[in-house]
């Protein structure tokens, strides 16, 4: 499948979108009382070129594995790769779900952010009992996760919609909170993946235009607030086509 005007894939051959954890207040804007709402922001800013650009010490995301490696700050580069266990398949509304065996995160710190020279390394991201949604392509993934309080349960919801004015399809991603979700363990987040090629499988057209929108909070009237993903070229509409 040919990707048109999406992103520069030269430096990243695995997942291109890495979204990890809550609490990145510099990137995800929400009120101090966001815990009172049924939806929880679940995303931070990212870079297609290098992976995710963190807005706080990464030690707050994955406990000792990262803290023992280094502290990462704004501007540090993180590239996430993972393997997929194709024997772990389950039926879902997103066509096919696969189990992910592990996630490895490689990082490079910027000079001065940790008080010294630039450093690099990698660590394994702990994963238990998770699914990857989507008919997986080798390179085209969305990865995201959440960091929830230990005493609360969360789950993700992905819905398809269509802009009636332009005909552009939309993938809306929410993090919901209720008693039926997954309880967070310590401060570990849960990554997931979604293949953007699924938009083709949901359409009879040879070329599909779509946007990715992720929930960042709710306003004072209780209305959901979404942010539309924009790639590094400033494009908000992603276009994919069949070969």
Q: For each predicted feature, which ranges?
A:
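First exposed extracellular module after export/assembly in secreted or surface-exposed proteins
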Residues: 4, 36-243
